[in-house]
Curated annotation (Swiss-Prot):
Protein family (similarity comment): Belongs to the E(R) family.
Organism: Schizosaccharomyces pombe (strain 972 / ATCC 24843)
Subunit structure, as described in the record: Homodimer. Component of the erh1-mmi1 complex. Interacts with mmi1 (via N-terminus) in a 2:2 stoichiometry.
GO cellular component labels: ascospore-type prospore nucleus; cytoplasm; heterochromatin island; nuclear exosome focus; nucleoplasm; nucleus; rDNA heterochromatin
SUPFAM superfamilies cross-referenced by the UniProt entry: ERH-like (SSF143875)
Domain of life: Eukaryota
Pfam families given in the database record: ER (PF01133)
A molecular-function term among this protein's GO annotations: molecular function inhibitor activity
Protein name: Enhancer of rudimentary homolog 1
Phenotypic consequence of gene deletion: Abnormal poly(A)-site selection of ssm4. Decreases degradation of mRNA containing a DSR (determinant of selective removal) region. Increases levels of mating and meiosis specific transcripts. Increases expression of ncRNAs responsive to environmental and developmental signals. Decreases expression of antisense RNAs, intergenic RNAs, tRNAs and 5S rRNA. Decreases heterochromatin formation at meiotic heterochromatin islands. Decreases heterochromatin formation at rDNA. Decreases mating efficiency. Decreases vegetative cell population growth. Sensitive to cold. Sensitive to sorbitol.
Length: 104
């Protein structure tokens, strides 16, 4: 699972429940920004403050319960947005959270 270039544009399409009214989208200039957005959605839904460390297993459970999440990543070669699976984003979120936990 190779990451996109650091400056890749990403559009996140998220549907939190089966009701289409729960659909949201967000637009990001990097993979890190997209992951930080997902972490922010988790913190908002779980009433976790930014200063608290994130329980990674609870984050994964929350992420698994999201009805649908599609990251569209801009590919300069094709000059198009390429859809990725929810697990692709989860993999990169895991790397991000693991690295964040190692920072004192």
């Amino acid at each position: 699972m190779s990451p996109p270039p650091a400056e890749s544009h990403i559009i996140l399409l998220i549907q939190q429940g089966s009701d289409p009214k729960t659909r949201i989208w967000s637009d990001h200039c990097s993979l890190r920004s997209a992951i930080e957005y997902i972490v922010g959605v988790y913190q908002t839904n779980q009433a976790v403050s930014e200063k608290e460390s994130i329980d990674v297993s609870r984050f994964f459970n929350f992420f698994d319960e999201i009805y649908d999440c599609v990251p569209l990543v801009y590919d300069r070669h094709f000059r198009a947005y390429i859809p990725h699976e929810k697990q692709w984003l989860l993999h990169h979120a895991q790397e991000y959270l693991t690295a964040a936990r190692q920072i004192p």
